[in-house]
Amino acid sequence: MKPLIKHRTATFLALMFVCLPSFGQAVMTNAPPTAKDPQPPAVAEPDKAWSFSVSAYTYIVPDSREYVQPTLTADRGWLHLEARYNYEALETGSVWLGYNFAGGKKLAWEFTPMLGGVFGDTTGIAPGYKGTLSWWKLELSSEGEYVFDTRDSSGSFFYNWSELTLAPVEWFRFGLVTQRTRAYQTDREIQRGLLAGFSFKHVNFTTYLFNPDESRPTVVLAVGLEF
């Protein structure tokens, strides 16, 4: 019996000799990193890219000259920059600085308070705003400003443009529009009308019909590009 025991003991020791290094290597491989182990570098979040929009509104006003009102906007994160021409008055420009706010999911909203400088035929300082409220296929949008005319206080005025639209499909919308302006002469303090527009990729086209109850309503043709 003793030779058999010695043989088994020798076999067991040989197996231990072979397996222990492999077991130790596996333990070292699976061991958690120590405090001295190098950590992967943190990846900085990239800055939000700029987004731009360009639009041109062509006004066809009865018994008045036709004119084009262009607007350029640039946004990056919270920052909003904007430039307009022929908005507050003809041959008048304005530049704007704003702060973007946004929130909501089902009922989404955006709001941008702004401060602008007006120069040209009308000169002054103008606090303003832009905002949208969206739910389902409905959207309410509004932009306004109050121009403090620094040349003539009687020229101070509140401007507003508001839309309520329904988009049954992604590329088409229609609805109601109102505006309050002094860019051209009108007998109505607030003009009301209808709108219909469609979009293709980054381009959108909209037709506005103000004062449709009049024999000669005001027509505005708008085209916009976003990139």
What is each of the regions a protein language model found here?
Residues 50-60, 70-72, 76-88, 107-119, ...:
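Transmembrane beta-strand segments that form the barrel wall of outer-membrane beta-barrel proteins
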Residues 1-48, 227:
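Cleavable N-terminal export/targeting peptides
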Residues 66-77, 92-110, 125-140, 156-168, ...:
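Feature captures outer-membrane beta-barrel proteins of Gram-negative bacteria and organelles
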Residues 22-24, 29, 114, 118, ...:
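Intrinsically disordered, low-complexity segments enriched in small/polar residues
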Residues 47-51, 65:
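Onset of an N-terminal alpha helix
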